[in-house]
């Protein structure tokens, strides 16, 4: 099981993309310099969509520091994930 970090947002299918975009902007305003988005399984597309909307809204205010894709074993099944690390630019 993955431990959630304080600057990590786990993307699920229940919230809207706009809500996650607002969550990231609020975290940047609270003083976090880096925020990590993690989409698992069917939520991978939503994590990418959150990044695209953030890039459209903030432009050069954020940079993509790192993006990882892979799979992890959960209950003897492989589940794909994407991890997108964003950094705030001053």
Curated annotation (Swiss-Prot):
Its main location: cytoplasm. It is found in: Cytoplasm; Chromosome. GO terms for molecular function: double-stranded DNA binding; RNA binding. One of its GO terms (biological process) is chromosome condensation. Keywords: Chromosome, Cytoplasm, DNA condensation, DNA-binding. GO terms for cellular component: chromosome; cytoplasm. It comes from the Archaea. Disulfide bonds: none annotated. Pfam families: Alba. Belongs to the histone-like Alba family. Binds double-stranded DNA tightly but without sequence specificity. Involved in DNA compaction. This is DNA/RNA-binding protein Alba 2. It comes from Sulfurisphaera tokodaii (strain DSM 16993 / JCM 10545 / NBRC 100140 / 7) (Sulfolobus tokodaii).
